[in-house]
Amino acid sequence: IKKLSRKEKSLIVEIHSSLMGYKLGSSICCSGICLTVTSKNKNTFKADISYETMNKTNAKYWKVGKKINLEKSLKVGDEISGHFVFGHIDTTCSVEELYKVGSSWFLSFKFPKNLKKFIVQKGSISLNGISLTINEVKSNKCHCMIIPHTYKYTDIHTYKKNEILNLEVDMLARYAHSSNS
């Protein structure tokens, strides 16, 4: 993050980016949050973060210099690797544990109990925009195993105990639950 500017109850963020091929109005997933490019230069872009988004996400804790995950939106015909991540954050969660197991990493986190109906073993979840497979769920805590590539090329390697992450439940789980209600 290059710059943060408060504007009433919202925020304007300027982000260094090596992403290519985006334009004004493009949606970019920023640590899991779908943000719209409102201006851009060669190596940076700006986006507005609304009051609602500030309240629902960890953006309120962002600081200049923080490294965040960035990903452009898919286009029809693009490969889908992982699950559908929309950038519509449900809530935040907190890191419980992160430690190495063999060549992988064990990550556990707590989530609000009202989301348990969408979080299932071997289902998908997005943390800070990273598509992950849920290994186990117990009460309002679950864990995922992180492969070395994901650990190295995302912000997971920076996580500390109690760090606040953006959580988006799997939209297919949400729709499946909705159709059964």
Summary of predicted features, one role per range:
Residues I1-S181:
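Conserved loop->alpha-helix
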